[in-house]
Amino acid sequence: SFEELKDGKPLGWRPRTYQPQAVFEVDSPGRSGERSVKISSTGGADASWSTIVKVKPYSRYRLSGWIKTRDIKSAGGKGVLLNIHQQPGMETRALTGTNDWTRIELIFDSGLNDALQINCLFGGWGKVSGEAWFDDIQLEYISGRALKPQATIYANQNLAPVSKYIYGQFIEHLGRCIYQGLWAE
């Protein structure tokens, strides 16, 4: 939800422009409240409203939201969608054309991440033109794994000896080239 504002922007969200000519607005009404966020462009843009959220590593989440579009035309971009920034394949289906409020969702695994950037994306790896509204963005925890890290140390066990050739190799040569022969361990 985008109901709380700070300095005219939704609390915790910020506009990002990847390719110029995007107009960012907080618009009324929203799908379920007084406000939604809007991105528009007449000349084509690749932009987003973005927020950083904390997640549990190795957990499954559902990212969902509602999008409304008017005259979205692709100029190389996918359309209007939600995605997890810099996480390949973590994106919803893209909307183009004109659509009333449409629910979209993505189920994903957080991997080893403990924080992720959610984007309300206008464009998607290329430009689109038109208008898009986003509202009721939710991130729901579905399930997770209990991590039980463990290590076994065999202090009395002798392993292979360190080779006499481990030093004097490429990395030390590189050190002489870069650090003028100064080497620290």
Protein language model features and the residues they cover:
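Extracellular and organelle-lumenal recognition/adhesion modules and their flexible linkers in secreted
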Residues: 1-165, 181-185
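Structural recognition of the beta-strand scaffold that forms the well-ordered cores
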Residues: 166-171, 175-177
